[in-house]
Amino acid sequence: MKTFNQFGQPVGEALSNWQPRQHPSRVVLQGRYCRLEPLRVEHANALFSAYSLAEDTRSWTWLLREPDATAEEFAEWVANVSELSDPIHFTVIDNQTRSPVGTLSLMRIDPKNGVVEVGHVHFSPLLSRTPMSTEAQYLLMRYVFDTLGYRRYEWKCNSLNEPSRKAALRLGFQFEGRFRQALVIKGHNRDTDWFSILDKEWSALALSLIHISEPTRHAQI
């Protein structure tokens, strides 16, 4: 809603009751098909094996880092990032097999303004294009909006990454625009596409996603 100041200038909607939100925690988020656990070194070998099921390394093309040549290299990366407070990496655990099948994270965390981005999404062939993949995204969204009370949830990707762009739209993100020449990644220019979901959009969106997930619970660890 547009409001006006004493000079008759349009200013943003007044948020007189707004308070900074809590920083996301290392929580477990339980769903029907999968659960999210904070990334731990104990997940590394199973994750490396799951990623190795891919026929090639094309799933790494859009990531910020190159593929790890060995399980030891991957485990070292996990050890380096698993205790970070931003980004907070989560492992997706298949409820049937109880095995790690992918990762995603909360990043660029801004509690003061209630803004956070989902990123570092890397799903193995065991997770991609399954009900688990949508549920994993839903569980993280629900935590951000319903538990933490954030106002804005972001998704950013390389403008050439068509699968990521389609996934964002399928999950209910709204395209906001393109930041040209935003980054240099692996020696190549990257134009970055921005997407978002707002808190006022979440209730309706959750209804469209809820059929794939039973009520969730989370427990801090």
For every predicted segment, state its role.
Residues K2-V41, N45, E55-W60, S213:
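Conserved N-terminal entry element of GNAT/NAT acetyltransferase domains
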Residues E55, S59-G114, V121:
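A conserved beta-strand-loop-helix scaffold within acyl/acetyltransferase catalytic domains
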Residues I93, G119-P131:
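A short, internal acetyl-CoA/4′-phosphopantetheine-binding micro-motif in the GNAT/acyltransferase core
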Residues I109-G119, S128, G149-R151:
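A conserved beta-turn-beta hairpin within the catalytic core of GNAT-like acetyltransferases
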Residues D146-K156:
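Conserved GNAT acetyl-CoA-binding A-motif
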Residues W155-R165:
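Conserved beta-strand-loop-alpha-helix junction that forms the acyl-donor binding cleft
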Residues Q174-H188:
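Conserved catalytic-core motifs of GNAT/GCN5-like acyltransferases
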Residues I210-I221:
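Single conserved hydrophobic/aromatic residue that forms the stacking wall/gate
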